[in-house]
């Protein structure tokens, strides 16, 4: 098949179709949705929360070994939606980059710098025929010394933007519609409201009530800027508060 034929646009990452599309990049976005996971991120006035559905594909798996939340440094967290193997590779490289940044400059890598680095790396993967785009959307969260709580989303095409709230993966548009209503008047959510808004969005989109073991919740707070994953007991408290409120 010649490079100019329709199939050629599908096979070669670096060739634009006559309509100006890069099919392999579009397929990377489809791979993210094909993972069947929905992720939510919400930024409050003094905290950031990310939530994702925790699916254990095999009953014999140890569910503590299944995660989509990764600490990059003590203060930066990453929620990966999509292909887990691609995510782990990206996370390891991001950790190396953050450690090198700390060694070179003497302070922690800011959230926006990490997001830009991930986006730059993803964009390079769209230029070379011997690489393929990563099938991962990464949400990066942390507290910026100057700007406070920060939430960024990086996609396989190399875009990265700061968000008040966002979603990735399956049913992401439905989640964004839900979040737009919640964020309409630019509310200043407390820590509890931030976490519960994120969990409520996931429940609303997937139309099910979760057990604490079925979701993962990662948070960073201004008064304690370390990234951490909530325990099942802490998640249970928020689920109870949501059910009582509703």
Curated annotation (Swiss-Prot):
Its primary localisation, in coarse terms, equals: cytoplasm
Tell me which SUPFAM superfamilies the record gives.
N-terminal nucleophile aminohydrolases (Ntn hydrolases)
The record's InterPro entries line, in alphabetical order, gives:
Ntn_hydrolases_N, Proteasome_alpha, Proteasome_alpha-type, Proteasome_asu_N, Proteasome_sua/b, Proteasome_subunit_alpha6
A biological process (GO) of this protein is: proteasome-mediated ubiquitin-dependent protein catabolic process
Q: Which UniProt keywords apply?
A: Cytoplasm, Nucleus, Proteasome
Q: Where in the cell is it found?
A: Cytoplasm; Nucleus
Superkingdom as given in the UniProt entry: Eukaryota
Query: A cellular component term (GO) from this record?
Result: nucleus
NCBIfam families annotated for this entry?
PRK03996.1
Purpose: The proteasome is a multicatalytic proteinase complex which is characterized by its ability to cleave peptides with Arg, Phe, Tyr, Leu, and Glu adjacent to the leaving group at neutral or slightly basic pH. The proteasome has an ATP-dependent proteolytic activity.
What family does the Swiss-Prot or TrEMBL record give for this protein?
Belongs to the peptidase T1A family.
**Self-association and partners:** The 26S proteasome consists of a 20S proteasome core and two 19S regulatory subunits. The 20S proteasome core is composed of 28 subunits that are arranged in four stacked rings, resulting in a barrel-shaped structure. The two end rings are each formed by seven alpha subunits, and the two central rings are each formed by seven beta subunits. The catalytic chamber with the active sites is on the inside of the barrel.
Please report the name of this protein according to its UniProt entry.
Answer: Proteasome subunit alpha type-6
Q: Which organism is it from?
A: Glycine max
* Gene that specifies this protein: PAA1
